[in-house]
Amino acid sequence: MPVSKEYVEYVLDQLSCLGPIAHKRMFGGVGLYFDGLFFGLIDDDIVYFKVDDITRRRYEAARTKPFQPGGEGPSQSSYYSLPVNVLEDLDQLKAWASEAVEVARRKASSKNARSAKRK
């Protein structure tokens, strides 16, 4: 689904509370990067943050939806939509975004460790 330029600018402005955020258009959406880590995305003017088995519970408790690029159906997504009220509250947003960055950092570290073992 399309992502509006205005919405991307709004999200980037809100996320500036975390620090410099890079973004890149991809597959009709926008990828969000902090310190080179892919921690979130925007699709159809909805923000999704990276989750793991621990942080997913917080999103499920907030009744947010998993990112499902292929439509509805059973999915164990690594990305969940951000509650709208969190996007509007900079203190909460910084906490949720920082958590998503840490999830991305842990996943990147575990991938690097697996790659090193194979060599």
Model-found features: residue ranges?
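Charge-dense, helix-prone N-terminal extensions
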Residues: 1-119
